[in-house]
Design a protein with these regions (language model features):
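His/Asp/Glu-enriched, well-ordered alpha-helical/loop segment
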Residues: 5-115
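Glycine-rich anion/phosphate-binding loop at the beta-strand->alpha-helix junction
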Residues: 1-3
Length: 146
């Protein structure tokens, strides 16, 4: 969505009534090229990451935008702080479907994602590690130098 539209949505609804989700398909993130997909047939992943019907680039064949890009975009588009943007992508969707939302407190499951925030608008949020039940299941935990 264009930046002005996102900004209008957030202003009109307020952050209390907004959530961030992604419907990214399984082929997203694959290198550019042509692939066979059992759901839609032959697809093509373009250099810019878009997923289209092979030979018909005007027809999208699935979403390719990761939630990390959505977080960075809403921060820029709606002039939102990081804590609020992450909340819209984690706590709010969980609450909306009645799922237990995570918390940093004694006895709570140690499930979280460690990421780096871009220093410029051109950079992407980078996932450094995913921790599930206190175990690193993706990446490596980064520890700052003391």
């Amino acid at each position: 969505l264009p930046a002005a539209v996102v900004k209008s949505f957030v202003r009109g609804k307020t952050t209390d009534r907004c959530v961030l989700v992604s419907d990214m398909v399984g082929m997203a993130g694959m290198p550019p090229g042509r692939y066979e997909n059992s759901a839609v047939g032959d697809i093509e992943i373009l250099d810019d990451g878009r997923i289209v019907v092979a030979g018909q680039r005007q027809y999208l064949a699935g979403a390719s935008l990761p939630l990390t890009v959505g977080i960075a975009n809403i921060m820029r588009f709606a002039e939102m702080d990081l804590a609020t943007a992450v909340d819209l992508a984690s706590q709010r969707p969980a609450q909306l479907i009645g799922a237990a939302a995570g918390a940093f407190e004694v006895g709570a499951p140690a499930d979280f994602i460690q990421f780096s925030v871009p220093s410029s608008v051109e950079d992407r949020i980078q996932i450094l590690a995913t921790i599930k039940a206190a175990n690193v299941v993706y990446g490596t935990l980064w520890e700052p130098a003391i």
